[in-house]
């Protein structure tokens, strides 16, 4: 069962989302809010697995709310709900640590599936946003191998992150304790100069596309 918290400033939209997601036996809507302030007060108490956040809110925006919530609840997964798409908005969502974004005209069943996918640890990110993130991460050091400072084990870990695996799944693959994997992930993110595993996953995925077969992470 995936616990979901909804943040949207339109009550009619929230009611529709509650009815839609609540009808799925695998989803449990544990709370809702209409503003950033309400969300910051209610989400920690509700302890959801996934927070569905509207981009436009009366006292802020869903991107900043995502960043603030994740700073307090690192295991939370955020799904950004937007009425439009742009490379800049998608990049902002990734950099804030969001696990994905969906456009508001998405079909009901697809939204429920997206929430469950994010709750299961998978990322819903656009290839264009991934490419934009890569360009930003490379910057002036584009000619330098971004993996040069990583050990073989860290490269393996990066590849598994790109598959959207959870710490437990990675632990099983690498024959390590789950707590050890968590520590390794933190160290890997520090080396890459990133804050969220989602960023590392996007980085690794795009790196695989830009390199010859067999020369990835």
Curated annotation (Swiss-Prot):
UniProt-reported outcome of changing residue 8 to N: No phosphorylation by DevS (DosS)
Effect of inactivating the gene: Strains deleted for this gene show hypervirulence upon intravenous inoculation in the mouse and DBA/2 model. However contradictory results were shown for using a devR/devS deletion strain in rabbits, guinea pigs and C57BL/6 mice. All studies agree that deletion strains fail to induce the dormancy regulon genes in response to hypoxia, NO, and CO. Deletion has no effect on expression of dosT.
Domain Response regulatory: 3-119
Induction and repression of expression: A member of the dormancy regulon. Moderately expressed under aerobic conditions, it is strongly induced in response to reduced oxygen tension (hypoxia), low levels of nitric oxide (NO) and carbon monoxide (CO). It is hoped that this regulon will give insight into the latent, or dormant phase of infection. Expression under hypoxic conditions, but not aerobically, is autoregulated. Member of the Rv3134c-devR-devS operon.
4-aspartylphosphate found at: 54
Residues that bear Phosphothreonine: 198, 205
Cellular localisation: Cytoplasm; Host cytoplasmic vesicle, Host phagosome
Known outcome of mutating residue 198 to A: Decreases phosphorylation by PknH
Residue ranges of the annotated DNA-binding region, renumbered to this chain: 167-186
Keyword Protein transport recorded: no
CDD domains: LuxR_C_like (cd06170), REC_NarL-like (cd17535)
Main localisation: cytoplasm
Effect on the protein of changing residue 9 to N: No phosphorylation by DevS (DosS)
The protein's role, per its UniProt record: Member of the two-component regulatory system DevR/DevS (also called DosR/DosS) involved in onset of the dormancy response. Regulates an approximately 48-member regulon. When phosphorylated binds and activates the promoter of DevR regulon genes in response to hypoxia. The presence of target DNA increases stability of phospho-DevR in vitro. Activates its own transcription under hypoxic but not aerobic conditions, probably binds as a dimer to tandem binding sites within the devR and hspX promoters. Accepts a phosphate group from DevS (DosS) and from DosT. Does not regulate transcription of dosT.
PANTHER family with a match to the protein in the record: TRANSCRIPTIONAL REGULATORY PROTEIN NARL-RELATED, TWO-COMPONENT RESPONSE REGULATOR
Subunit relationships: Homodimer. Interacts with NarL.
Misc. remarks from the entry: The dev nomenclature derives from the increased expression (differentially expressed in virulent strain, dev) of these genes in virulent H37Rv versus avirulent H37Ra. The dos nomenclature derives from experiments in M.bovis showing the same genes are essential for dormancy survival (dos).
Name of the featured protein: DNA-binding transcriptional activator DevR/DosR
Native organism: Mycobacterium tuberculosis (strain ATCC 25618 / H37Rv)
């Amino acid at each position: 069962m995936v616990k979901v918290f909804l943040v949207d400033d339109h009550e009619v939209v929230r009611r529709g989302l509650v009815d839609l997601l609540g009808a799925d036996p695998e989803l449990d809507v544990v709370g809702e809010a209409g503003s950033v302030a309400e969300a910051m007060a209610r989400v920690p108490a509700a302890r959801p697995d996934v927070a569905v956040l509207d981009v436009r809110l009366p006292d802020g925006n869903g991107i900043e709310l995502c960043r603030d919530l994740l700073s307090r609840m690192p295991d939370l997964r955020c799904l950004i709900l937007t009425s439009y798409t742009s490379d800049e908005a998608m990049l902002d969502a990734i950099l804030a640590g969001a696990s994905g974004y969906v456009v508001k005209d998405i079909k009901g069943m697809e939204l429920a599936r997206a929430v469950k996918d994010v709750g299961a640890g998978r990322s819903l990110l656009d290839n264009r946003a991934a490419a934009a993130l890569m360009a930003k991460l490379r910057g002036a050091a584009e000619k330098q191998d971004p993996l040069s400072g990583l050990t073989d084990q860290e490269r393996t870990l990066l590849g598994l992150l790109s598959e959207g695996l959870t710490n437990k799944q990675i632990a099983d693959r690498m024959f390590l304790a789950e707590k050890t994997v968590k520590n390794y992930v933190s160290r890997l993110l520090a080396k890459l100069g990133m804050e969220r595993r989602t960023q590392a996953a996007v980085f690794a995925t795009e790196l695989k596309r830009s390199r010859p077969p067999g020369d990835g992470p």
